UniProtKB/Swiss-Prot annotation:
Protein's UniProt keywords contain Transferase: yes
Source species of the chain: Streptococcus thermophilus (strain CNRZ 1066)
GO BP term, pick one: DNA-templated DNA replication
InterPro entries: DNA_pol3_alpha_NTPase_dom, DNA_pol3_finger, DNA_PolC-like_N_II, DNA_PolC-type_N_I, DnaE2/DnaE/PolC, DNAPol_HHH, DnaQ, Exonuclease_RNaseT/DNA_pol3
Listed CDD domains: DEDDh (cd06127), PHP_PolIIIA_POLC (cd07435), polC_OBF (cd04484)
One example GO MF annotation: DNA binding
Gene, per the UniProt record: polC
Cross-referenced PANTHER family: DNA POLYMERASE III POLC-TYPE (PTHR32294:SF5), DNA POLYMERASE III SUBUNIT ALPHA (PTHR32294)
GO CC annotations, alphabetized: cytoplasm
Keywords: Cytoplasm, DNA replication, DNA-directed DNA polymerase, Exonuclease, Hydrolase, Nuclease, Nucleotidyltransferase, Transferase
Protein name: DNA polymerase III PolC-type
HAMAP family found in the cross-reference section: DNApol_PolC
Lineage of the species this protein comes from: Bacteria, Bacillati, Bacillota, Bacilli, Lactobacillales
Amino acid sequence: MSDKFKLLLKQIHFPQHEEAYNEIKSGSIESVKLFKSKRQWFFVFSFRNLLSYETFTLFDNLLHSSFDSLGAKVSYMINVEDISCDQSLLEAYFSYALDILKSSHFSIYSLFSNLGIEISNNSISVKAPAHILRENLHERFIALIADVLSNVGLSNVSISVLEDKEASSSLEEAYETNKISLQEEAESQARQALQSIVQSSPVPPPQKHQAQNFAEKQSQRVASFDKAEITPMIEVNSEENRIVFEGYIFDVEQRETKTGRIIINFKVTDYTSSFAMQRWVKDSEELVKFGMIKKGNWVRVRGRIENNPFTHSLTMNVQDIKEISHTPRKDLMPEGQKRVEFHAHTNMSTMDAIPTVEELIDTAAFWGHPAVAITDHANVQSFPHGYHKAKKAGIKAIFGLEANLVEDKVPIVYNSENLELKEATYVVFDVETTGLSAVHNDLIQIAASKMHKGNIVEQFDEFIDPGYPLSAFTTELTGITDNHVKGAKPLVQVLQEFQEFCKGAVLVAHNATFDVGFMNANYERHQLPTISQPVIDTLEFARNLYPEYKRHGLGPLTKRFGVALDHHHMANYDAEATGRLLFIFIKDVFEKHGLTNLEQLNTELVSDDSYKKSRVKHATLYVQNQTGLKNIFKLVSLSNVSYFEGVARIPRKVLDEYREGIIVGSACADGEVFDTLLSHGIDKAVEVAKYYDFIEVMPPAIYAPLIAKDLIKDEGAIEQLIRDLIEVANRLDKPVLATGNVHYINPEDAIYREIIVRALGQGAMINRPIGKEENAQPAPLPEAHFRTTNEMLDEFAFLGKDLAYEIVVANTQAMANQIEEVEVVKKDLYTPYIDRAEEQVAEMTYAKAFELYGNPLPDIIDLRIEKELSSILGNGFAVIYLASQMLVNRSNERGYLVGSRGSVGSSFVATMIGITEVNPMPPHYLCPKCQHSEFITDGSYGSGFDLPDKECSECGTEYKKDGQDIPFETFLGFDGDKVPDIDLNFSGDDQPSAHLDVRDIFGEQYAFRAGTVGTVADRTAYGFVKGYERDYNKFYRDAEVDRLAMGVAGVKRNTGQHPGGIVVIPNYMDVYDFTPVQYPADDVTAAWQTTHFNFHDIDENVLKLDILGHDDPTMIRKLQDLSGIDPKDIRADDPDVMKLFSGTEVLGVTPEQIGTSTGVLGIPEFGTNFVRGMVEETHPTTFAELLQLSGLSHGTDVWLGNAQDLIKEGIATLKTVIGCRDDIMVYLMHAGLDPKMAFTIMERVRKGMWLKISEEERNGYIQAMRENNVPDWYIESCGKIKYMFPKAHAAAYVMMALRVAYFKVHHPIYYYCAYFSIRAKAFELKTMSAGLDAVKARMEDIKEKRQRNEATNLENDLFTTLEIVNEMLERGFTFGQLDLYKSQATEFLIEGDTLIPPFIALEGLGENVAKQLVAAREEGEFLSKTELRKRGGLSSTLVERLDEMGILGNMPEDNQLSLFDDFF
């Protein structure tokens, strides 16, 4: 005890009795401060241990009372060396903190004082209702409590506030109930007041009519509701009473409270905004009155707008609601006079359009349009769905796309001549203009430098007055002001002088097509000769000379080559800089390629892939007939596979090659006809338009963004452009089609596209900012909704009625009539051809059957094979079976087992030829010596593995046992004609080889990965909406955010590939008969091409093999390699293995040691928390019961709320509940139902259709079931099921799981080695090697984080690993440290009873580095850390980590030893 502290204790009269004084005397005063003016003292005390609560309160009371008696104040803070404390002490200190809070912050105290508190292990958890969390009041509470506890020495206590969902629900219900009771009370008081007024008033004379009854009052209320003024939702931003809205319900959720009341939460939009609404309903009877509250309905609602304390947003509490009719937009033109839309995008246009193809076609059909075209950007992924939908809707679908057309080779030199590059004279020029259109904009500066052999010999620089003030945009971009151009020479004079300046020279410009185009347009306008001398485009020169550069603009090039460019976008500076670059290029092209002549630049420098840098122009391509469909498929494939560069491109020569059967339209403002017209005028546009079959014109509103971009002056100019486009078509006698460039259906949907497009960021061309700095904004998006005929005619009314009708209706109908109906998706299955496939399958089947069951075969086997082969061979499925057998056999030969998935195990033929290990026959005995067999067909056993052991009645050999009792019908349907879906689980290590096997068997040109289309997910859509809200200064209430996110979700974002699916095209056809192809995610370096269509769209037409990678076969292979035990020799009924499912004794541990009451941790199929819980509830003892569990765990609404309740209530057992789909058919047939009906019932139940079929059909099934004594609980259970797992799939999984479990029981060190090498996802070596206490402590730490929802994904994975680590340690095995010379790269190493971890188990050390490290140590010992970093490929951080763990021992930093070290 310090002297100062001893003196303090004496002054406050601290009693020196033994217990308290002995505890506190270890203290000392670290510091003390005195604030004289406030008479306030502040102490910092230090104690070795935390004071007991009794000693602390005694000290605290004496300290405060002593200073109070002196008229002074005191406060303090305590520091403690050892801050550990037990639960009771922490509870006491927490109570003290609450008391302090009560006196200082009563409002916070009152909220938290009566809440549930959980205290343990230096952590305090408080459960609070949701509104406290939403108001962030818990953060203030945590801070205050933590401050108090820290001051008394408890600085390490973790405090968290979690939501008490039960309390939240009860409070919300109480809140609503209280509101209702208050309302009723107020109404009662009003009635009483009214009654007293009436009683005190004189009696009125008799009236002719009696007072209104309740029904009349209600009628008046309804009438007032019907006539009430409708308020737009956007106008309501605060609490209000009796507001009336009308809108569309887009989301509904209802739930029942504990008291039986029902709350209906729904969301409504009127497309100005959206509101969350709720209606409380007393019971299910009253709920019927509110049947109109369902998604998709339009309603009128009246209610109070209140700030909901639980959602923290404005919510309408609905008082009145009624369904209203809503009339969607209609096409009012008479039948036969309706347009055809020829330019429409669906949500398959990547991040650009909203409607599904079904919505587009439905709208066109509803309007009575005879046809509608699909023209997505550069893809045809909506074709299959569009094809099926159009057939269903009775409308012609026109299949097309908006392609990216590029020139094959873009020249460097125009008007080329035979000139030596080093000897020529060049005029390097640049122009500045008021816009990008040579027709609609004007020249304001021409500047040039005449250069010879790198030197400037003369310059030209003239401004030109356009005759009107320059726009702010022009001045901002070019730096040219009205003062520059005012009083300048006339344009014609400048043009003449410039022509004279250029005589005898080669012209040079950067992006010469623009500058030359502008000059020629002005020359023509003033009857001057156009440019005829050679022109070098330095942009294309740079692209071909430096293809490795990503950017070839003037700015980036001058920076790269150190050329000055002081005022970019002023012509004189740009021209001089371009000239300097030209002579650098001339020098480099000679040194790199030996080129000296102007003509050589085009013939020898322009590369074959110059299309990659060529400017993309849009063109619309349409399928005219079946030949055209295949050619479109080829074009899409080539554009994605051979010509992809940023986007899928189609070179003009490629389009020419495959143009048969295709109609080509001129597309939108990004098409070359429109661009040429805008830039060069009608004559040039006519030349370009010759390539196209028709010319598109679009509503002026579609072109309106060009005004914002300063490409067009005003709406009048847009109308003139449309007239000019029609003139172009008329000169060529080509039809003009008015198209809408549709990107969404209704005008109010524009916001969805706005959000999607802006989510692309400013890097996207469509979002390029106009203006600079704070004025920079992207151009507005056009009004691109689907227009009716009337709306379209109105858009073109300025052309006159007849011309408008011609381009809107007559021409579009005529063009649609030229297009034939095509078959996009074929009707039949086309399997590849393998020679003698049918014979091979039959021969292999019978050969194996004879080997196992003898010849002649037992009748039950013979009939089953005959039945299956009849279906398999008769429907052309033999090749599917044979291909699967070949793949499995090849993997087996490489040493891997292959697990089957799905229902293939229902086929006995599949079993016989080696596709699956699952035997679907009824449970049976089979003699391995004499082939005698006994079948159990009465349903008494669910699996042959559960039969009691028995010796052969013929020869005395112990029988083998097999058979899972699975009908063949569950695989290929009752009539055996369903396309077989054979899914196989290959080892993840062997999967790549299995994929290559498919190519080897069928040919590379016939095997493709199954393609997928990735769309905007719900959470991503929500993020897009919030991002738009942030970036564009919007504010949306929560319901509106939800509505917008729903509108945005589903838009195509990318493409990908199925993890294991491979599509096989028949070798007598080609892939373009079915689908285009591409690379996944546009990765042209990928090893495999994929189907362009989502594979589900063609899975009934071509063979799809699911060759999936799975851990189970890899694990089995690892265990076989470690033990030498053949996994096929492991019995499925090992009694010790079965004990894992009922306890832990077989592992030699107690439940308390491993934290679970069974031994299934880490066992495939049974090791998850969910299934472990099922195992603990049911304690399965047979293989059949394990199959049940597998089915129950994989199904939907099969266990929870169904079988689980039946078992708990003693109504059924694990054996008798419905587990797998096949069990239904087998059970019902054993009960006496007709097999066909049993099969149909199974199909209805497994797909969740039981309650969706007609009542008449369902009652027929129920009657048949009851007549055959099927219990009611079974029938009711059928009605709850949404999805069921195939028994064959369950059997395959359980067989694999039991093999793994065998090693866990009998060869544990092998099991743990395999588990950690293959299945574990996260490691923490420091913890794993520190022993049981450290492992258990870390697990508790993660558990606490989970309770607070603070655990990371990595920690959750680590917890799973640590569960197995804990079990392994409890069983007496240990983890060693990483060893620089023993550890493997990726797999654990067994050393006695110890596992040595691999290098990848170290955080931050990846597989490639681990392999490099192992390879490096083979070359020799690491003599220093420096050498370890260099040869081993380790970062400094990893070397430091290894050193900290003691793995490097005394390894020096470097190995530059002194000369004398070798003597010691």
